[in-house]
Amino acid sequence: MADFLPSRSVLSVCFPGCVLTNGEAEQQRKSKEIDKCLSREKTYVKRLVKILLLGAGESGKSTFLKQMRIIHGQDFDQRAREEFRPTIYSNVIKGMRVLVDAREKLHIPWGDNKNQLHGDKLMAFDTRAPMAAQGMVETRVFLQYLPAIRALWEDSGIQNAYDRRREFQLGESVKYFLDNLDKLGVPDYIPSQQDILLARRPTKGIHEYDFEIKNVPFKMVDVGGQRSERKRWFECFDSVTSILFLVSSSEFDQVLMEDRQTNRLTESLNIFETIVNNRVFSNVSIILFLNKTDLLEEKVQVVSIKDYFLEFEGDPHCLRDVQKFLVECFRGKRRDQQQRPLYHHFTTAINTENIRLVFRDVKDTILHDNLKQLMLQ
């Protein structure tokens, strides 16, 4: 006698909910998979270390983010390096135009009067052209201007203008690129890692970089530091684990590009005061990066910080005295001195090894301070 096998319809009547159609089974499988994904996402979000890079414009935030990519992620491949070439060419042309203009305004004579023609050529460069307006210059165009740029950089008038650069706005990497014109002038020039770190383009909008360290997910967020970009900062404040506040420590004698009046260090102090006393960040680790130590070390030899900050006491030409003063200035901006300790580091963002060592300490500080929240115990 053949075994009696009840039909699907009989089973569904006797045991409702136990028999699924193929479509229902697939739907249930997808639902379970979605639940697993949501659970993993929830765990990821709880363990995520979200680090916000804040600071005034040109403090080194974007350079620091590039270093994170080099140290903890994929290095810049050839295609990524090539993408920086138009930016570097733009940095050079823009920098030389600034120097030519400064030489004239400062009434510095040409070393060779024939270079007036080269200067005129640079000043006639169309900055409103589509690519130039975006901070990029094609190789073909750059090579047309290269002989004039080289002749100008060798002129004593331009060199004298450069020596007085704190009297006007000049990018800090301009000298590096002008000293390497032979390399930049090769038609198939590929930017090196150091070239990329020194390439300057203002940050517009929000840039994020994700990486992992020992199975701990990190998200680093860079937001433009110019005044026009700071309104975007509030978009990034949610679920912040730590803030790295970068300061260009060498700019105590310079003014903002935005208004050409406000002292840059004073601007950084004002921004920091707003951030460090914001209740939103009462449980957030705030770490101060006094950046551009290499430039500060050079500057204190020839410029007295006391001329700009009368309250300074100590030797204005002693790096340690100046650094101690800077730390005290930022510590003094905290209204509640009993809140979390303010960690600080002296950094040089273009130095990969320096940033590697500093971030190792920063990472340990962040993980230690947020152990419970990150569920790492």
UniProtKB/Swiss-Prot annotation:
Record-listed Phosphothreonine modification sites:
T203
Which UniProt keywords are present, listed alphabetically? Cytoplasm, GTP-binding, Lipoprotein, Magnesium, Membrane, Metal-binding, Nucleotide-binding, Nucleus, Palmitate, Phosphoprotein, Transducer
Q: What is its main location?
A: membrane
Q: What happens when the gene is disrupted?
A: Confers increased susceptibility to lymphomagenesis of germinal center origin with bone marrow involvement.
Question: Where is the stretch described as G5 motif?
Answer: 347-352
Q: Per the record, GO CC terms?
A: cytoplasm; cytosol; heterotrimeric G-protein complex; melanosome; nucleus; plasma membrane; postsynapse
Instruction: Name the job this protein performs.
Output: Guanine nucleotide-binding proteins (G proteins) are involved as modulators or transducers in various transmembrane signaling systems. Activates effector molecule RhoA by binding and activating RhoGEFs (ARHGEF1/p115RhoGEF, ARHGEF11/PDZ-RhoGEF and ARHGEF12/LARG). GNA13-dependent Rho signaling subsequently regulates transcription factor AP-1 (activating protein-1). Promotes tumor cell invasion and metastasis by activating Rho/ROCK signaling pathway. Inhibits CDH1-mediated cell adhesion in a process independent from Rho activation.
Annotated family:
Belongs to the G-alpha family. G(12) subfamily.
Its protein name is Guanine nucleotide-binding protein subunit alpha-13
Q: Which organism is it from?
A: Mus musculus (Mouse)
Q: Which gene encodes it?
A: Gna13
